């Protein structure tokens, strides 16, 4: 397999990437417990999953669960093989890898500047391929298309989710499947660019923005109080204590609306600024911050599907 990849002319671009170091190793051990008689018992049907970076037990699984070819370094190699097999130009590609402190989740993001959309006045968005994997059952191995707006480094959320690949078991991707899915992903990315351009020309009222942020933040009080003014709503405890909603509203009124205008593109960028940059809640476990980001992206997807023009 390595010899095949070395023959790929795009390999030279991946060779320029900084290596990902310090990856944990996943291991397992038998489940043991003390019964009512004080005896130490081994459960023959279960085992616990741990990593070399933490003493945490990150999952309890059936005995036949395997992480053969599913170690974090395997996922990195698979991510490289996948984008090589996809047939796209990888010149200038960058990579970002994030792993939760206890090793239970990992995320790899490739940004591919050879596929860039300019939606006007130099406002550029670059194509991304995202790889997700977890060992605590949060999500299965997933490959998804994404994008990043270069002006603010917001991770763009596609209105139509494009999961290129999912697997609950040992990950592997057929080269033909990778190429086919990449063609679909780039077409979707280009279609999203056309949608974003339309949003720049689609004017929006403050109330439309307010309701869209409430949808993403799960602020039901706003959505059920159409007769109340924005001013009155902002005085209500159910609104001003919703940190996600207030983050988006403040981002919109103090930045996006000021620089982009009162339009759906500005609303969208306030949404993606929240999903990309907003801090996790005070009670959020540090090992669940990656989960929070993905959950926010799904909330944004739902809001734009119901509140912004197609």
Model-derived regions: residue spans:
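Charge-dense, intrinsically disordered terminal/linker segments
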Residues: 60-68, 77-80, 94, 98, ...
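Intrinsically disordered, low-complexity coil segments
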Residues: 55, 84-89, 117-125
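Feature for intrinsically disordered/low-complexity regulatory segments and propeptides
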Residues: 1-77, 87
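A short acidic/basic microdomain associated with nuclease active sites
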Residues: 84-114
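Intrinsically disordered, low-complexity regions enriched in serine/threonine
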Residues: 1-34, 97-98, 111-310
